[in-house]
Amino acid sequence: MMQNLARDIDAILITGPTASGKSALAVKLAQRHGGVVINADSMQVYGTLKVLTARPDQSEMGGVEHFLYGHIPPGRAYSTGVWLREAEALVARLGKEGRLPVFVGGTGLYFKALTGGLSDMPEIPLETRKRLRTRLTEEGAEALHGELSARDPETAGRVRPSDGQRIVRALEIIEATGRPIGSYQQSRGPVIIDPARAQKIVVLPERPVLHGRIDRRFETMLARGAVEEVRALLALRLPPEMPVMKAIGVPQIAAMLKGEMSEKQVIEAGAAATRQYAKRQMTWFRNQLDETWQRIEDPDALG
């Protein structure tokens, strides 16, 4: 089946948790089918933190052209909508050139938008985001859920009182536009990749295997320059609510630079945070990706 892939489909989509080996698989399949690799990870778009976000280096690219990696300054806002517009332009260009796009990354929402369209959500002012996230920290999710119940009872009924992120998102929309989030979710943009015309792969390694990779990877990141990356990032004095400032490893290494943590503690804390993130990713993939996604434990099985 894999040998005839390029003639039968319009794209390859590969997702999976961090450290699952999906990037190497993407390169291998792109090499085999004369394709290119397109990033679908929300952290790997930033021009900083190449090591901490495990952005592929030249030797790992295997001579395959890579797109949407490291092209966004760390202080610039970036959203799923922006990524989707960039991906759409690339897909159109590659189609004219007769080259196969191989999307790879761990941001599940990117794949949902790519194959199912994206609701036309409005941009939220940074000040509104900051204020509501501060309130979430200070008041807690249940208090904000009570406010959402009064302002948008329909959405509040669908959101758990403990789900702070979704509650804040719904309140952001109301405050920015005066309209409930549901009014935007009802309309969706165009589908960029027809899911019936794509080979869809999700890499789900066994937990002990994945955890071993994560532990080794974080220690290697420190040895390869992650501390210097964070030092340079902190020198930019970006607002703490910027996504790049929340990347796994940044808070831990920043604490070490302040003398608040040892290197050993940073490695342990960073690996633990990565394992938690991988757990959330795997839960999302299992719940959100349907049976048309090919589930594999070992990327080498597709060799």
From Swiss-Prot:
Monomer. It comes from Rhizobium meliloti (strain 1021) (Ensifer meliloti). Its cofactor is Mg(2+). It comes from the Bacteria. Residues 41-44, 165-169 are annotated as: Interaction with substrate tRNA. GO terms for biological process: tRNA modification. Signal peptide: none annotated. GO terms for molecular function: ATP binding; tRNA dimethylallyltransferase activity. Residues 141-161 are annotated as: Disordered. The keyword Protein transport does not apply. Catalyzes the transfer of a dimethylallyl group onto the adenine at position 37 in tRNAs that read codons beginning with uridine, leading to the formation of N6-(dimethylallyl)adenosine (i(6)A). Substrate binds at T18, A19, S20, G21, K22, S23. Belongs to the IPP transferase family. ATP binds at G16, P17, T18, A19, S20, G21, K22, S23. The record marks T107, R129 as: Interaction with substrate tRNA. The keyword Acyltransferase does not apply. This is tRNA dimethylallyltransferase. It catalyses: adenosine(37) in tRNA + dimethylallyl diphosphate = N(6)-dimethylallyladenosine(37) in tRNA + diphosphate. It holds the Pfam family IPPT.
